[in-house]
Amino acid sequence: MGKRKSSKPPPKKVVQKLPKHFDCLFCAHSQSVDCILDRELGKGVAKCRVCNASYETPIHELSDAIDVYSDWIDACESIR
């Protein structure tokens, strides 16, 4: 009698990393906006390296760079 065929363990799910650099809303350069999170002061800053446009917003411990950038987009849309 033979041995049972052992099954392979299921493959691990690939977790995509969140971006840290974004496209500028004003000068349209790609990957030119850097988001800096200062958790001690509780503020996040998104700043373009090309046109120096910047946006500052309050953050909390669960905030990430994408949250600061999306707040900037929402603020620009509310003005228009």
UniProtKB/Swiss-Prot annotation:
A Gene Ontology BP annotation from the UniProt entry: transcription elongation by RNA polymerase II
Keywords: Metal-binding, Nucleus, Transcription, Transcription regulation, Zinc, Zinc-finger
Main subcellular localisation: nucleus
GO cellular component terms listed in the entry, alphabetical order: nucleus; transcription elongation factor complex
GO molecular function: RNA polymerase II complex binding; zinc ion binding
InterPro entries named among the record's database cross-references: Elf1, T_Elf1_sf
Positions bound to Zn(2+): 24, 27, 48, 51
Highest rank taxon of the organism: Eukaryota
Pfam family for this entry, one: Zn_ribbon_Elf1
Compartments where found: Nucleus
Record-stated family: Belongs to the ELOF1 family.
Function: Transcription elongation factor implicated in the maintenance of proper chromatin structure in actively transcribed regions.
Protein name: Transcription elongation factor 1 homolog
Name of encoding gene: elof1
